[in-house]
Amino acid sequence: MNVFGMLRVKNEARWIERVIESIWPVCDCIFVFDDHSDDGTPDLCESLGAVVYPSPFEGIHEARDKDYLLQKVWEIAEAGDWCLMVDGDEALYEPDIPAVERAIESAAVCCSLHIVYLWDREDQIRVDRWYREFRRPSLFKLTQRNLSFMRTTFGGNLHCSSAPIQLLSSITPIPARLLHYGYLYRNDRVRKYHFYNTIDPNNAFEDRYRHMVIGDLFPAASAFKWAGPLELKPLAAS
């Protein structure tokens, strides 16, 4: 049995080294789909031992890109192998590696990990409401060759999950955390807020992404649909 790391990335040079190094202990191979990065991300990935596939596509379509990468995995994988799919700014928390290893040896087929949002400092996380317990399916077993990622109604086919749609009806939560660095700094949070509202405008379900910038563009005391007022605590207490 092999475990394949999977990443779909664009311009993640700041974080990619720690991300790839964090998942190597549980992976036999790491495959990266690079979406036209111009900051050296592909070279960094290759220097860390990952196999990089430059995007042959134009435009944003997350599910299409993930399907393409999964087909590349299938070129050498077999049914019964596993995949760990993380973003280019998410690192597997080292103390939780044994939980991932146990899950791979279990009867589960799809496992969710706790996404921990680092906020303002690397030793501090956001914990108000949705942010406290947010989990995402990221570890899955290759059960059949027709696995694919779901199509959504959101712009850019955002929010298509990190596990194939065929496995989302049987999700096992495991005590493992991914440290999310992409919201660590205010400038990045504001940039992401404007990016999401540009490619996925007027998304009422996501409350127009206002939760991302509570304490930045909106007062810290704001209470919106998914989050707020802003609450932070030490990573060590998570």
Each language-model region and where it sits:
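Cell-envelope/extracellular polymer assembly enzymes that use nucleotide-activated donors
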Residues: 2-4
